């Protein structure tokens, strides 16, 4: 009783010694706030005590404080002064502590290289740790320490761990090799290449994923390394990581263009000879056709279809790129890629940045073949949740998909957006899309011109940039049929004085009036008279167009002059206005305006009126909407894509003479066989050949079962059934002094030696077999 009371008193004494700090740490498991206050109490004096403590919990608290100071940029504690106390914990048994020390080393190793080198031995010893996470962390820490003299040590460690039994460590080997290649460059190619070949032949998909990243970043041109892995990679494509799937697709596109035969297109409506798949996506001349693909190319395309339902949007975009570059429009449409891409545009689980990339991909495909997405044009109507960039790309897609059958719905949608949208950039793109719709037919052209003119003339406050874009659209549409739109030109001329227009809006109107000199010359002189007094206050582009307008008026006036006397510029009212504009332009600040004034003065002073007529009054071709007539599908600059997307969709040419290559699968390296462990998997996974019936050794041991089992170490053990085990119960009760005989059969020599000893023992003694090690072996007297 006294002893029990003493134990209780000792427990209370230990509980009283529990400090407030330890209690705060314990309560931190319930929330972050309590630990935050406790962490604040760790100052520069108490931190070394925690870092040098023999208790892992206190060391972890100290390292958490260090991480907090590093992350917040707090300079209240000079962490560099505690370098030795922190780094010595690199050999801690706690993996979390090791990770935090590694992060600290990454930050401060360069400031204390000598002290950092003292931890290398501990890190190298961790490469032999039984925990694969610890081994991978040690390898990562070695590569993160940015000290040039460590390169030989890191390379030696990589050569050792590239055949590690854990796939986690081998993945880290690939990442470390990539890091070394970025630092050292092509100089270490000979050292990295053998390890890369080993990683590419790995049986684990996770290791292959890391190896493909290394291959793409460091050896993208060494495609011949993939010959023996091509077919295996196609079969395990869906097992790779999502990032590696996109990488492998890009690599195999280049591989197929270089080493695989180009698909053949055969016209099924005639007996014409088959042709090679054209370089451009939509240049197949046959209305009905079939495509013959090489076996290996078809294997790759078939494996891609499994990824169309991937949760990663970039994987689906990569799949669409592969079909776009390697197949025909018919195969592209039949593969289901269109539905997968459309699903991404409306998914609520995808961020706006990814949707922008998906829409740019669709824009490229629509420019190549609008029929792919034309039936889904309503999926590109603007939504209230769309960002500005998403809306702009949708409008560009609509401008390509517009046709006579869907023009009514698209125009109505654009008018609605123009009346509700506030963003100037979106409204400018709406105007550009309307200009494409107006080119469908003269009916739509008249309706859109009337609507745009009403929008500009209304008192509704509109951004000047939007007004300028609408005027430019009007100019391009009026130029197509100037006689029909004289009234519209008169209204535009009045806007020069009634509206506060941007230079980008004024200059097109003045240019359009100059083109109308031959159609209706009575409008232009009065406009020029009102523009000349404001010449010096206008923008350079506007001043240049005023000078051109004066020259066009004078040239037309000279051509239409029918008097008997020679035309006199000085006595003509139009000639006088031209002289005034010429005089103002000669002293202009802009070189372009002065140069144009000198050229025009030279022409008219030397009376070269024919040249003036050809130069100023020649009919100009009216502009066309480039997106609606995207004949060259590879001219991506006209689509205003992001620079990275332009590079991503750069077309790779087919190799005209692909080299014959052996794509027979090479030997796969399975490192899981190196794992030495005795478990249920090692037992039940054994080949049936290992379970054999052994012959009876002697009559004295006839009761011992003859079944044997061979362990993963090569040792043999006898097995016993449940009935045989319980059959010896009565014998053991009748002979209480009998000793247990445990027999181990590791080799044939040990078996013979055991038989000799068993023959000299008593035959009445019972035996019992079980799984034992050599340290438990006993013999009978």
From Swiss-Prot:
Keyword Ribonucleoprotein: no
Transmembrane segments: none
Protein keywords: Cytoplasmic vesicle, Golgi apparatus, Membrane, Protein transport, Repeat, Transport
Any one Gene Ontology BP term: Golgi to vacuole transport
Gene Ontology CC annotations of this record: AP-3 adaptor complex; clathrin-coated vesicle membrane; Golgi apparatus
UniProt feature, compositional bias: Acidic residues: 746-758
Positions of region (Disordered): 694-713, 731-781
HEAT repeat residue numbers: 113-151, 153-186, 187-224, 294-332, 521-559
Top-level taxon of origin: Eukaryota
Keyword Manganese found: no
Pfam families hit by this protein: Adaptin_N (PF01602)
Compartment list: Golgi apparatus; Cytoplasmic vesicle, Clathrin-coated vesicle membrane
Gene3D superfamilies registered for this protein in UniProt: Leucine-rich Repeat Variant
Xref: PANTHER family: ADAPTOR COMPLEX SUBUNIT BETA FAMILY MEMBER
Protein name, entry field: AP-3 complex subunit beta
């Amino acid at each position: 009783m006294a002893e029990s009371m003493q134990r209780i008193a000792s427990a209370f004494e230990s509980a009283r010694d529990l400090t407030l700090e330890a209690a705060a740490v314990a309560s931190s498991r319930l929330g972050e706030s309590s630990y935050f206050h406790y962490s604040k109490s760790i100052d520069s004096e108490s931190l070394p005590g925690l870092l040098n403590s023999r208790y892992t919990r206190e060391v972890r608290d100290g390292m958490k404080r260090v991480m907090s100071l590093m992350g917040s940029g707090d300079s209240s504690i000079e962490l560099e002064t505690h370098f030795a106390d922190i780094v010595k914990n690199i050999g801690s048994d706690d993996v979390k502590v090791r990770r935090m020390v590694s992060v600290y080393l990454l930050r401060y190793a360069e400031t204390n290289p000598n002290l950092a080198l003292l931890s290398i031995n501990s890190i190298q010893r961790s490469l032999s740790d039984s925990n694969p996470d610890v081994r991978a962390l040690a390898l990562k820490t070695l590569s993160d320490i940015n000290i040039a003299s460590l390169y030989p040590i890191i390379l030696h460690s990589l050569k050792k761990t590239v055949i590690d039994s854990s796939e986690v460590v081998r993945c880290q080997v690939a990442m470390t090799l990539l890091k070394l290649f970025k630092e050292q460059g092509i100089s270490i190619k000979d050292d990295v290449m053998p390890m890369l070949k080993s990683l590419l032949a790995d049986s684990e998909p996770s290791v292959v994923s890391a190896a493909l990243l290394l291959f793409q970043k460091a050896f993208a041109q060494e495609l011949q390394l993939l010959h023996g892995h091509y077919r295996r990679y196609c079969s395990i494509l869906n097992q790779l990581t999502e990032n590696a799937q996109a990488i492998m697709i890009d690599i195999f596109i280049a591989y197929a263009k270089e080493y695989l035969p180009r698909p053949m297109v055969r016209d099924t409506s005639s007996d014409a000879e088959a042709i090679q798949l054209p370089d451009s996506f939509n240049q197949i001349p046959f209305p009905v056709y079939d495509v013959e693909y090489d076996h290996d190319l078809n294997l790759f395309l078939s494996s891609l279809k499994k990824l169309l339902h991937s949760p990663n949007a970039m994987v689906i975009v990569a799949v669409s790129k592969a079909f776009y570059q390697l197949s025909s429009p018919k195969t592209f449409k039949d593969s289901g890629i269109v539905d997968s891409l459309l699903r991404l545009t409306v998914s609520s689980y995808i961020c706006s940045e990814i949707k922008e990339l998906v829409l740019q991909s669709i824009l490229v495909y629509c420019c190549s073949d609008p029929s792919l997405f034309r039936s889904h044009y309503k999926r590109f109507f603007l939504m209230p949740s769309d960002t500005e960039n998403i809306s702009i790309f949708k409008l560009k897609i609509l401008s390509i998909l517009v046709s006579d059958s869907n023009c009514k719905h698209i125009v109505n949608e654009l008018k609605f957006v123009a009346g509700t949208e506030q963003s100037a950039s979106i409204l400018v793109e709406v105007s550009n899309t309307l200009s494409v719709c107006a080119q469908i037919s003269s009916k739509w052209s008249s309706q859109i011109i009337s609507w745009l003119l009403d929008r500009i003339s209304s008192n509704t406050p509109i951004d000047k940039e939007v007004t300028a874009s609408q005027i430019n659209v009007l100019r391009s549409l009026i130029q197509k049929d100037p006689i029909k739109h004289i009234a519209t030109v008169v209204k535009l001329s009045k806007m020069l004085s009634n509206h506060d227009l941007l230079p980008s809006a004024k200059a097109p109107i003045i240019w359009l009036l100059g083109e109308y000199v031959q159609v209706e010359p009575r409008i232009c002189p009065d406009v020029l008279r009102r523009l000349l007094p404001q010449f010096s206050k206008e923008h350079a582009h506007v001043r240049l167009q005023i000078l051109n307008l004066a020259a066009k008026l004078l040239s037309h006036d000279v051509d239409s002059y029918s008097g008997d006397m020679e035309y006199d510029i000085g006595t003509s009212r139009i000639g006088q206005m031209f002289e005034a504009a010429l005089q103002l332009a000669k002293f202009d600040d802009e070189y372009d305006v002065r140069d144009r004034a000198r050229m025009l003065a030279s022409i008219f002073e030397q009376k070269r009126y024919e040249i003036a007529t050809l130069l100023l009054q020649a009919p100009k071709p009216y502009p066309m909407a480039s997106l609606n007539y995207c004949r060259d599908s590879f001219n991506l600059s006209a689509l205003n894509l992001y620079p990275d997307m332009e590079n991503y969709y750069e077309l790779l040419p087919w190799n005209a003479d692909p080299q014959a290559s052996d794509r027979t699968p090479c030997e796969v390296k399975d490192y899981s066989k190196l794992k030495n462990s005795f478990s249920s998997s090692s037992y039940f996974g054994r080949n049936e050949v290992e379970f054999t019936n052994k012959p009876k050794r002697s009559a004295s041991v006839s009761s011992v079962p003859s079944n044997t089992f061979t362990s993963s170490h090569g040792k043999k053990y006898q097995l016993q059934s449940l009935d045989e085990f319980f059959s010896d119960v009565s014998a053991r009760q009748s002979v209480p002094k009998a000793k247990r005989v445990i027999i181990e059969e590791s080799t044939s020599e040990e078996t013979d030696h055991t038989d000799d000893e068993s023959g000299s023992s008593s035959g009445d003694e019972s035996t019992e077999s079980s799984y034992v090690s050599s340290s438990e072996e006993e013999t009978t007297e």
